[in-house]
């Protein structure tokens, strides 16, 4: 509601749609007073039931615009491209308003400029009269046009000017515009005559400090991160965005599904009431009139979760009268040009590969990204890219919507002493029976990235699955790789890319190179490229090569991607094995898929002395292995009567706080529909007593029916743990948990990284050698849950700098690991406290010891926090059979404190 100088001007509804007020008759010369009242709730609120914070206030820009009394009040640009996509025409419909009462004559001019400001064409029309009128200026026979696409977002400038009878310019403005065609043929969508896959995300206006008043810097941060992650489509769920964001999407290159501010959510039958027709039409019409000049807008969406009523039939007709773009509405396919669904399973997608409701199939929401999520994304896109009628989809959603606790923020407090953000969720506000129908608990936090826009393991997976380049058929002997260009328009050329490679030996970088010049690979084609790799490969180590397509400053008029990515940024990549033991007929396996698990060679101790003792009897019995290594450092390992390791020291320093035992603790948001039991202990027993044989010693311990561990002790202090798990029920994880002593903070690992990854979310995480700290391995979700897994572990090195001791772990067989200072038992309970409580990371106690998991397998993440798949069968922990890995521990003095990062 608006007043000027105390006089009422007008009122508007729709919190996320622009409103204009003519205040000409209310202003006076000099200072004026503008007053605004924002109603938090009104009847329009029933059409704004989106999954978001419902906050009060003005959260977008307010402008004051002055015009002549006779002025161009609207302009509508349309164009068409010929089949060659480089020639066509443009029409600009101008609406002229005359507020002067008397007749006037004006010259209207439209000028088309290219990116460099060169005039391409111009045209004029004359307005004469005193009534509102429309005039159309046509620019025909345009040639040598540069078409717009998300891959190459070339923008022209359309300048509109108005001159008086004497030729003096009275007003002028410009609009950025791109030439592109949108066509539907069969059950596919084409941009400029090319089939396009819409690789998208749903978005919200959210900022952890400013709430819904998102600033330009954050908008640009979001969009550049999306581009870097190969996202090409944005659904403005579930309301139009600020105009500035559309300008950014035009310039950076995105396909946009522009969605009206209409969502009934819990009250979807509202739309069946014809009394809402005018309100629905108003919201959709205002969106279309504002945004129809943006080339990035490909689809109009009539709203979300508002039922199937005929209200949207009328809204569709209104939209078609204003613009001819394709229309989407998931609630009723008869009002939509697209078939659409939310949260299908992979099998559902597979069964609709030729289309949905006999229309192009667009999955408007899928892969619900709440918490530790985005499992089996690859399987979705295997189906989509192998289809004849699926055009893509949008992940729900881009960013977690939590904000800083307002009570702490006003005191300048954003982080706890342990470095966790003071983020809150719907659970922190007046819930009823654990459910808040205004803020829906944690259902505002479904983001791929965190509220402060931190890159996550989820986003790494999206980047990999969404990438437009496929590397395959790597020949380890010839050092050649097949590169398939899956872009719709963009050639892979040395004009704008370089092909880089990095060779690693057991995770350490041994060779780094690039190709600056290579044969151009046009969109839709493939070529084989040979890399000048010089590294000699043998069977003494694992050799891997990372191949990357890197962005560089363009030449010869190529599209400039350095506007959103730094030079050298890898926009697409793959990893292959160079090792002979992983090679068959010269063709190496890519590490995107099934890996060869490492094999530990037999071990011979390089010196040292070992002794074993058994003391006490019955429940007081202890088993001790002690000795000195080849450097004269003493070690001791003690087991209690049941075989539980109770002490392990090296050079007088404690290595453990608790010995290994079976541990099945695992809980993430996607597990809410998965029922399992948790345990971190078993009924252990010594089945084969501690015995020395030659220079070595052995002991066998049974952990009830869960597992058996065969220990082998070597004189130099090395310990092998060969663990065989016996699975008899479906669990969330199968593995051992243990606690390392305080001080083992520095971490080096040779596994998939650098960010967390899981069995069904690891294609975007490559094998490498990474350094970090235990504290930095936390995935800071809004609510605590299992985190930090790293698949395909080869080696782990923990360093206690203060004590000057280091503990190395090498792996034989399949294994993953995670490390933490936090006890998972705090959120992995038999109840539902993880989801129905105010538990935050900053509420948890950081313990000094290091909680470690060594898993044979952890259940895949799936995407079942809302619809979708709980976990595909390939990633479910087996419920029967025996499974083995070996962990080889070796303590030593901490001489390798400064560890290479590659």
Where are the model-predicted features located?
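Aromatic-lined ligand-binding clefts that engage carbohydrates, nucleic acids, or primary amines
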Residues: 1-5, 34-36, 106-109, 490-492, ...
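Beta-strand-rich ligand-recognition modules
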Residues: 3-33, 37-51, 130-149, 213
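Extended substrate-binding grooves/exosites of carbohydrate-active enzymes
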Residues: 7, 12, 19, 43-46, ...
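An acidic-aromatic loop/edge-strand motif
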Residues: 15, 23-90, 98-100, 173-179, ...
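Extended acidic/polar, glycine-enriched regions
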Residues: 28-31, 93-183, 546-551, 562, ...
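Solvent-exposed, conformationally flexible loop/turn segments
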Residues: 29, 87, 128-134, 518-526, ...
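Beta-strand/loop-rich accessory regions of lumenal/periplasmic or secreted enzymes
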Residues: 40, 149, 532-540, 555, ...
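Carbohydrate-binding surfaces of carbohydrate-active enzymes
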Residues: 94, 99, 384-638, 721
């Amino acid at each position: 509601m608006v007043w000027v100088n105390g006089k009422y001007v007008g009122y508007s509804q729709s919190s996320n749609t622009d409103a204009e007020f003519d205040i000409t008759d209310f202003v006076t010369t000099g200072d004026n007073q503008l007053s605004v009242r924002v109603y938090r709730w009104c009847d329009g609120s029933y059409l704004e039931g989106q999954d978001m914070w419902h906050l009060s206030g003005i959260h977008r820009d307010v402008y004051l615009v002055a015009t002549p009394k006779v002025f161009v009040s609207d302009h509508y640009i349309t164009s068409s491209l010929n089949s060659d996509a480089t020639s066509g025409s443009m029409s600009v419909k101008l609406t002229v308003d005359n507020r002067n009462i008397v007749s006037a004559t004006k010259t209207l001019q439209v000028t088309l400029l290219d990116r460099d400001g060169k005039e391409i064409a111009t045209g004029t029309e004359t307005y004469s009269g005193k009534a509102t009128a429309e005039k159309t200026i046509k620019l025909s026979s345009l040639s040598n046009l540069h078409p717009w696409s998300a891959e190459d977002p070339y923008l022209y400038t359309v300048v509109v000017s108005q001159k008086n009878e004497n030729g003096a310019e009275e007003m002028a403005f410009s609009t950025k515009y791109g030439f592109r065609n949108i066509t539907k043929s069969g059950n596919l969508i084409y941009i400029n005559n090319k089939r396009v896959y819409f690789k998208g995300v749903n978005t919200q206006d959210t900022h952890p400090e400013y709430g819904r008043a998102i600033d330009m810097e954050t908008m640009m941060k979001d969009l550049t991160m999306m581009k870097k992650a190969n996202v090409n489509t944005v659904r403005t769920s579930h309301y139009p965005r600020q105009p500035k964001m559309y300008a950014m999407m035009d310039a950076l290159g995105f396909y946009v599904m522009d969605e009206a501010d209409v969502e009934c959510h819990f009250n979807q039958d509202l739309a069946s009431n014809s009394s809402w027709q005018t309100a629905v039409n108003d919201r959709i019409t205002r969106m279309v009139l504002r945004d129809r000049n943006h080339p990035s807008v490909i689809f109009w969406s009539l709203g979300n979760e508002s039922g199937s009523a005929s209200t949207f039939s009328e809204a569709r007709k209104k939209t078609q009268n204003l613009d001819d773009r394709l229309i989407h509405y998931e609630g009723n396919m008869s009002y939509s040009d697209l078939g659409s669904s939310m949260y299908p399973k992979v099998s559902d997608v597979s069964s609709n590969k030729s289309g949905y409701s006999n229309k192009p199939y667009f999955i408007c929401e899928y892969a619900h990204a709440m918490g530790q999520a985005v499992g089996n994304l690859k399987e979705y896109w295997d189906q989509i890219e192998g289809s004849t009628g699926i055009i893509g989809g949008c992940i729900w959603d881009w960013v977690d919507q939590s904000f800083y606790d307002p009570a702490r923020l006003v005191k300048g407090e954003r982080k706890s002493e342990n470095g966790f953000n003071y983020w809150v969720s719907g659970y922190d506000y007046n819930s009823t029976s654990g459910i808040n129908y205004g803020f829906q608990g944690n259902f505002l936090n479904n983001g791929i990235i965190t509220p402060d826009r931190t890159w996550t393991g989820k986003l790494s997976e999206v980047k990999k699955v969404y990438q437009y380049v496929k590397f395959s058929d790597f020949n380890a002997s010839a050092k050649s790789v097949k590169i398939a260009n899956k872009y719709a328009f963009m050639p892979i050329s040395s004009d704008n890319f370089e092909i880089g490679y990095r060779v690693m030996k057991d995770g350490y970088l041994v060779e780094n190179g690039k190709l600056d010049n290579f044969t151009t690979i046009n969109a839709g084609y493939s070529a084989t490229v040979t890399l000048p790799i010089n590294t000699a490969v043998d069977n003494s180590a694992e050799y891997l090569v990372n191949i990357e397509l890197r962005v560089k400053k363009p030449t010869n008029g190529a599209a400039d991607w350095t506007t959103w990515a730094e030079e050298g940024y890898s926009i697409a990549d793959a990893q292959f094995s160079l090792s002979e033991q992983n090679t068959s007929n010269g063709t190496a396996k890519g590490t995107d898929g099934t890996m060869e698990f490492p094999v530990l060679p037999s071990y011979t101790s390089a010196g040292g002395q070992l002794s074993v003792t058994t003391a006490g009897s019955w429940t007081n019995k202890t088993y001790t292995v002690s000795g000195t290594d080849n450097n004269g450092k003493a070690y001791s390992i003690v087991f209690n009567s049941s075989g539980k390791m109770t002490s392990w020291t090296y050079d007088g320093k404690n290595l453990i706080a608790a010995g290994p035992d079976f541990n099945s603790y695992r809980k993430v948001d996607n597990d809410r529909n998965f029922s399992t039991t948790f345990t971190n202990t078993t009924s252990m027993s010594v089945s084969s007593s501690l015995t020395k044989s030659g220079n070595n010693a052995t002991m066998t311990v049974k952990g009830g029916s869960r597992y058996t561990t065969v220990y082998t002790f070597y004189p130099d202090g090395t310990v092998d743990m060969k663990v065989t798990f016996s699975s008899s029920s479906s669990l969330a994880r199968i593995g051992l948990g243990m606690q390392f002593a305080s001080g083992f903070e520095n971490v080096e690992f040779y596994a998939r990284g650098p960010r967390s990854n899981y069995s069904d979310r690891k294609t975007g995480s490559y094998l490498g050698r990474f350094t970090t700290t235990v504290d930095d391995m936390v995935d800071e979700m809004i609510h605590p849950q299992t985190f930090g897994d790293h698949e395909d572990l080869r080696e782990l090195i923990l360093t206690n700098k203060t004590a000057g001791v280091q503990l190395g772990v090498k792996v034989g067989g399949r294994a993953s690991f995670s490390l933490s200072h936090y006890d998972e038992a705090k959120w992995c309970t038999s109840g539902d406290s993880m989801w129905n409580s105010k538990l935050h990371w900053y509420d948890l106690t950081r313990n000094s010891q290091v909680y470690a998991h060594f898993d044979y397998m952890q259940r895949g993440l799936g995407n079942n926090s809302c619809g979708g798949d709980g976990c595909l069968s390939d990633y479910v922990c087996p419920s029967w059979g025996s499974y083995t890995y070996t962990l080889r521990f070796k303590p030593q003095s901490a001489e390798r404190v400064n560890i290479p990062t590659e």
